[in-house]
Amino acid sequence: MISADSRPRLARKARLRTDRHTGETLLLYPEHGLVLSPSAAAILRLCDGRSAAAIADELAAPLDDVLEFLATLGDRGLVTT
């Protein structure tokens, strides 16, 4: 479970990449990929040891939205704490 104090990071199997043709940010993992919205990409780029609360503060985003997004990816094994 991800809380405000959790320090989320991408799972080892997941990678963020920018598509050189479209400029879109992709979350790649074995045999799959997701095209991320700009806000989703910003959240994941800040998963560098900061707490979830610090990520929300940095982006001026509602903490509940950040936690929900990270929990969804956590359920898929793409984010760990």
Name what the model sees in each region.
Residues 1-45:
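Acidic, low-complexity/disordered tracts enriched in E/D and polar residues
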Residues 32-81:
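Long, charge-rich, low-complexity alpha-helical segments
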